[in-house]
Amino acid sequence: MINDARTDVAAHAAWRVADAPHPAALDAPEAWAYHGIAEVERLSMIAEFGDEDLATRAIDLLASANHENHMRRRRIVAVEDGPDGAPLVVGHGVAHLWMTSNPHLAFVHVAVRPSHRRRGIGSALVQRLREIVVEEGRTTVIVDADFASEPDAASEPVLVPPTGSGSVAAGKPGVLLAQKNGLRLELVARRSVLDLPLPEGTAERFAAEARTAAGSEYRVHTWEDRIPEEWLGQYADLETRLTIDEPNADLAIEPDPWDADRVRAYDAQHAEAGKGYLITAVEHVPSGELVAMTMLLYAKDRPEVSEQETTVVLPDHRGHRLGMLVKAVNLQAHARVRPSTRRISTWNNENNPHMLAINVAFGFRPAGGAASFQGPVGG
């Protein structure tokens, strides 16, 4: 993503790169950029994965921009004049900037409308993002390249990260762009999809087996859309723990502290975006401590799909099948709350075999993934 060429790519005969305005509401005149970004994301997801299950919506962009105490975003758009003279977003880029940790780091994402690829738009967006990252004083950048299926090494060149887990086709446009700009493949994550409904009794059986393995020292709690006040601090501790334990290989991601205020800020952001969630957590009864949790997140205007988010078990309580327990109980709750959902998507690092094994046991199937590239801003 990062070379030192200083050619002027902010404008082109057919399109131009500009900062994305932040509207007060989605019906405001300035909302054209957020609506356009959402359409680019939708078309890009369909082109790569064949579905729009995980495509960012305009309301997601608005809600995240309204809640930036912990993560700030600098958004840019590539725009051309549409048939009616209105701006048409043909590509976009964003630099995600941690505000309470990782002051050295920017996570960068670029997407171009499929009909407008191979015109230099992606390179122009990358160059402008490089300038933004430098302006923000960040020294390291991470970028992901999505792919719909793991490549066949026997039939095409592939790249394998230093972890030795997973691979990505060397000829993918996102891979080529990352390498062109001096970034190195560090990690591959797997996207998995669980088709619903599960065979009758599946979640119940896994939950019963896990409860037996856990024993009487553990109590399960399930919450919808809001975590009770008395558990906020301990829930925040679990989120923090995930940032310590997640197997991120050599990605330069430092622990990211959570507290009760941050949890409530994300509650507010989810509510503003029209999202709901289910969290199942496990309490260690003798100590009164939360020691495991998992979350399912969903957009309420997308009844057919949900996302499996965070799952974490504290190190001292591993080996009791608590990861299986929280997921099984949460899936039972999800079946009651979201009976029309037909798919759950999730992402796991390929070097996390334990969590992948739990997902496979439930019936999650591989559905592509993402390759994470990293490098210095100066390339």
Regions found by a protein language model. Name each.
Residues M1-M71, D84-L88, A214-D261:
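Short amphipathic alpha-helix that is part of the acyltransferase structural core
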Residues S44-G82, P87, G91-P103, T243-V305, ...:
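A conserved beta-strand-loop-helix scaffold within acyl/acetyltransferase catalytic domains
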Residues R118-V134, V313, G319-Q332, A361:
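Conserved acetyl-CoA-binding loop-helix of GNAT-fold acetyltransferases
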Residues M1-A20, Q127-E230, A370-Q374:
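Acyl-donor-binding surface of acyltransferase catalytic domains
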Residues A292, H320, V326, P353-A370, ...:
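Conserved N-terminal glycine/acidic-rich loop preference
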Residues H109-R117, F147, E283, T310-G319:
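A short, internal acetyl-CoA/4′-phosphopantetheine-binding micro-motif in the GNAT/acyltransferase core
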Residues V89-H92, M99-S101, F107-P114, G122-S149:
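Long, mid-chain structured domain cores
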Residues W98-V108, R117, E136-V141, A299-E309, ...:
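A conserved beta-turn-beta hairpin within the catalytic core of GNAT-like acetyltransferases
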